[in-house]
Regions:
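N-terminal glycine/threonine-rich, aromatic-flanked beta-hairpin/loop signature
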Residues: 67-107, 183-209, 216-217
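Short, surface-exposed coil-to-beta transition loops
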Residues: 35, 68-73, 95-100, 117-124, ...
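A short, surface-exposed interaction/processing loop segment used at functional sites
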Residues: 142-153, 234-279
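Exposed beta-strand-loop-beta-strand "reactive/processing" segments of non-cytosolic proteins
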Residues: 206-234
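Contiguous, well-ordered beta-strand patches that form the walls/edges
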Residues: 18, 26-29, 90-133, 231-232
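Edge beta-strand at a domain terminus
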Residues: 99-105, 139-169, 263
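Amphipathic, heptad-repeat alpha-helical segments
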Residues: 1-18
């Protein structure tokens, strides 16, 4: 309820939302059982979220909040007055899983509280006037134990046959902060550019041990952190980059690119030490 309340303070008239929240809090005092409290929660959420009537649930919905190389797809089908079937696919890098649930319809929303293989994961889908769906789960407990490592079912879902998210770039991921550096990197690595994007499932800054004032970003794919990884190092004038992934025979292959030439003997210490974490030579 708190998450919905805070979100609606932004999207709706804050004064009205606050009044509805206070009225809901008072209604809880009239409850004498857990079932009554649960019903009051969903009634309050529906009112505060301004849930539209006659929402069209059936179809394929994509989680547009998911990170790069991660995602979620929910297929709602067999819609009835009080129930609907949800087929769910969630992934984060190479970690993935699929679930099926017969969800309940209540107060214009959809609630999953009987996920196959887990009775502790609850997910509430709230329809929005925009036509999107907002999903909230008990991720801190039940759903976190059920979902693939690093994956989340929470987020904003949009109905579409295909993934509606814009194609990611190293600039849109903010690995590069401006278009000029992104274009220079594209020119440097050529067709390998997309492979760097596809490796940027998780990415973090790391130290420039060469002390040349460079920005250094290392990245990897969840579920394959030791076999699908890359690093990019750049200054105002130069770029160095390397990537490791299995070749056609499953052996780890190393690729190196630099605006100063692709001689690995002249590779900066930052990249050389990074390489040693994964390859012995």
């Amino acid at each position: 309820m708190t998450s919905v309340y805070r979100a609606m303070l932004v999207y709706r008239d804050a004064g009205q939302v606050h009044q509805e929240f206070e009225a809901w809090e008072k209604s809880l005092g009239e409850c004498a059982s857990d079932d009554c409290i649960e019903r009051a929660y969903y009634t309050g959420i529906s009112r505060i979220a301004d849930v539209p009537s006659d929402f069209s649930w059936e179809g394929r919905w994509w989680n547009t909040s998911a990170a790069n190389v991660s995602g979620g797809v929910i297929q709602f089908s067999h819609s009835a007055d009080w129930s609907i079937v949800a087929d769910i696919r969630i992934w984060a890098g190479l970690n993935k899983d699929e679930f099926t649930a017969e969800a309940r319809k209540l107060n214009g929303m959809v609630l999953i509280d009987n996920m196959v293989d887990s009775k502790h994961c609850k997910v509430l889908f709230i329809p929005r006037l925009s036509g999107a769906i907002q999903a909230y789960s008990n991720a801190d407990w039940g759903c976190r134990l059920l979902m693939p490592s690093g994956a989340f079912i929470d987020g904003r879902y949009v109905k579409s046959d295909l993934d509606p998210r814009p194609k990611a770039t190293l600039q849109s991921l903010e690995i590069f902060r401006d278009a000029k550096v992104d274009e220079r990197f594209r020119a440097l690595v050529g067709d390998e550019y997309q492979k760097f994007v596809d490796t940027a499932n998780i990415y973090i800054y790391q130290d420039d041990i060469d002390n040349i004032g460079a920005t250094v970003v290392s990245m990897w794919v969840r579920g394959a952190a030791n076999t699908r990884t890359a690093i990019i190092m750049y200054t105002a004038n130069d770029i160095w980059a390397a990537r490791i992934e299995p070749d056609d025979k499953g052996k780890l292959a190393f690729s190196y690119f630099s605006t100063q030439g692709n001689d690995t003997a002249k590779m900066p210490r930052t990249l050389a030490e990074w390489k040693l974490r994964y390859l012995s030579q």
